[in-house]
């Protein structure tokens, strides 16, 4: 059983991105293991929502690159959450083709995945891309506040 908590996963993803940005840091393998455990557990939307808010703290392009790297470590059949987040970020960055690719991957894995279906509607209706930025800025502090020592997967 996993002993990764929401707050431990938050700290791990923050450290991973900071290490990715730093020219002198070495990314620790236990950091990626914690993150992959958290992402793999699709039953914990709290951590997924934290991932969606990362561009409040880090540049969007950096977050996209880091999550794309991490997605390669997530087991097949467990990638719908990270693909959905990557779809949102690609769409925000104006890369509609990549956004649709990630969205298709998420929906192919789980046609009923709520975030992927929400994004499908958002993309189809032509929402302003800035809408997600505004929502993220408003919601991310609340998401962080709700992160706790709940074991992911329990």
Which role fits each region the language model picked out?
Residues 1-154:
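Charged, compositionally biased boundary regions
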């Amino acid at each position: 059983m996993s002993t990764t908590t929401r707050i431990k996963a938050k700290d791990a993803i923050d450290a991973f991105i900071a290490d990715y940005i730093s020219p002198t840091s070495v990314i620790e393998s236990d950091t990626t293991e914690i993150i992959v455990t958290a992402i793999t557990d699709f039953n914990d939307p709290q951590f997924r929502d934290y991932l969606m808010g990362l561009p409040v703290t880090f540049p969007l392009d950096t977050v996209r690159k880091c999550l794309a790297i991490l997605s390669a470590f997530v087991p097949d059949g467990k990638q719908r959450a990270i693909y959905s987040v990557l779809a949102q970020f690609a769409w925000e960055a104006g890369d509609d083709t990549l956004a649709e690719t990630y969205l298709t991957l998420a929906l192919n894995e789980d046609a009923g995945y709520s975030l992927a279906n929400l994004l499908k509607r958002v993309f189809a209706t032509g929402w302003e891309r800035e809408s997600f930025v505004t929502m993220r800025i408003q919601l991310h502090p609340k998401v962080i506040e709700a992160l706790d020592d709940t074991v992911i997967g329990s």
